[in-house]
Structures are given as structure tokens and as C-alpha cells.
A protein has these predicted regions:
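N-terminal helical cap/lid subdomain that shapes the substrate entry/recognition surface
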Residues: 4-18, 22-116
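Short amphipathic alpha-helix with an adjacent loop that forms part of the alpha/beta core around
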Residues: 5-6, 240-250
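Short glycine/proline-centered loop/turn elements that form peptide/ligand docking sites
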Residues: 22, 119-120, 197-200, 215-224
Length: 251
């Protein structure tokens, strides 16, 4: 089988999802979600499954969308509440605030690391003239990239703060990826997207991007990534090669 490749004679920029692709945060997110949902679900429904429920309903989505999607899968509807709700209150915002506090407490205590294979791929791409972007649905996406010490490897960084300011819908809508391509001054067919979450892979497919790379996270299913639109599926970005180089733009 030939090596999976990013061909820089065809692709001139690469957009990376932050959580689970650039930063090793998926376990922390899943654990924070489980703690919050299990507290809420006690006496209402079965506990949150840290693999299946996380991957199917929450991973890759904006926080509040993830809450709505997961609770809908259990036949539960909550009032929206407001951004000043008490963390853990039985509202969409209340659960979201509790999850946010729990996750960021872990980050503040333990820090966050970047995946070495992703860092190596970023260096290879940039040495060959490709532009790069990091995209996150999280309000803390920028902080996570900075904490991992890799912000210098990206020309563009978009997170949940940008989405809120611009009123951009979350994945599986491709709006965040399309905004990244716009800021990179590239059209979608010139851009590859690397994502580990099913909504992100679907968003890249629906956005018409030139290459969609799915990374199989812990408990992930390669077949599902392909079904959602990944043209290349790998367990680790060390398996992705880079061919050619991006030629300088000429007037």
C-alpha cells in the first residue's frame, strides 16, 4: 500500500483541528463531560459512555451543541438558561459551564502537550512552503495552542471566540474551516483538513476541501471516518508523508 501523502503541488495549505489532532486533550474533555453528565443523569438515565457517547454526540462540536445533541439522544430536553447560570444548574448553559470549569482545572493543573507527530508534520509542511491553520470549537482553543508551545507553527488560529464574534455555526457546518481557508487566502480545493472528530470530517467534506484526513483517536472507527468523508484515514500523523513544495505566488 502506498504511503498516504499531502501533495503540495495540489494542496498549498493545511487546516488542523486543535483538540485531539494538535493538542492531546481528548481524554481530558471526555473525562470532564462524563463527570458533568453522570451527575446530571443520576436517577434520569444510564451513565454517559466515555467512548461511544463522547465520539458520537460531543466530540468536535461546540460545547452547547454537544450538550443538546447528547441529551436529545436520551430523549431529554433542558431549558437553555443563560451564560450567568450556576455551573451544574439543570440548563444547557449550566451544564456547559460545569464542563468548562472541570476541563480547564485539569489544564491549569497538568498543562497540555502537543502530539509529536503533528509537530513534525507541521515543520515538514512549513519548510516546504505550505501555510497552516489551527481551528477549534472551544473558547479556549487559543489558550491550549499557546500552552502547548506550538502557536508559532500556525499562520491562522480560529477558536470559539471567533465563531461567537462572527456568528459562525459549529461543525458539522463547514463555516469554521471555510473561514480558516479565507484567512489563509486559499480556496477550499487548495486546502487539506486534518480532523479526528466525525462532525469535523463531515464539515470538511461538505466544504469541498481538497483533501480530508481523518485521524483515528482512541476508540475511533476508521470506517466511520471514511463514511463521513475522510479520503485518507491514519492512526497517527507520522504515517502522512509530504510530497513536493508550494511554489511562491507570482504577480
Amino acid at each position: 500500500m502506498s504511503e498516504p501523502l499531502i501533495d503540495l503541488t495540489r494542496i498549498s495549505a493545511v487546516v488542523f483541528d486543535t483538540d485531539g489532532v494538535v493538542t492531546d486533550t481528548a481524554r481530558g474533555h471526555a473525562a470532564a463531560w462524563k463527570h458533568v453528565f453522570d451527575e446530571f443523569l443520576r436517577g434520569r438515565s444510564a451513565p454517559f459512555d466515555i467512548r461511544d457517547d463522547y465520539l458520537r454526540h460531543v466530540d468536535g462540536r461546540p460545547r452547547l451543541d454537544g450538550i443538546r445533541t447528547f441529551l436529545a439522544s436520551r430523549g431529554i430536553t433542558l431549558p437553555e438558561g443563560a451564560a450567568d447560570d450556576e455551573p451544574g444548574a439543570p440548563t444547557v448553559h449550566g451544564l456547559g459551564l460545569a464542563k468548562d470549569l472541570g476541563f480547564m482545572a485539569q489544564v491549569d493543573k497538568y498543562g497540555v502537550a502537543a502530539f509529536p507527530a503533528t509537530v513534525a508534520l507541521l515543520h515538514a509542511l512549513r519548510q516546504r512552503g505550505a501555510r497552516t491553520a489551527a481551528v477549534s470549537a472551544s473558547l479556549h482553543g487559543g489558550k491550549l495552542v499557546n500552552s502547548a508551545g506550538v502557536s508559532h507553527l500556525f499562520d491562522v488560529l480560529i477558536d470559539g471566540n471567533d465563531a461567537a464574534l462572527m456568528n459562525l455555526p459549529g461543525r458539522p457546518d463547514p463555516a469554521l474551516f471555510l473561514e480558516a481557508a479565507r484567512r489563509l487566502d486559499r480556496t477550499p480545493p487548495q486546502v487539506a483538513v486534518v480532523d479526528a472528530a466525525l462532525p469535523g470530517v463531515r464539515a470538511a467534506r461538505d466544504g469541498g476541501f481538497g483533501l480530508v484526513v481523518g485521524v483515528v483517536g482512541e476508540g475511533g472507527d476508521p470506517a466511520e471516518l471514511r463514511a463521513h468523508g475522510a479520503g485518507v484515514v491514519v492512526p497517527d500523523l507520522s504515517e502522512i508523508g509530504v510530497r513536493g513544495r508550494v511554489l511562491p505566488l507570482t504577480s
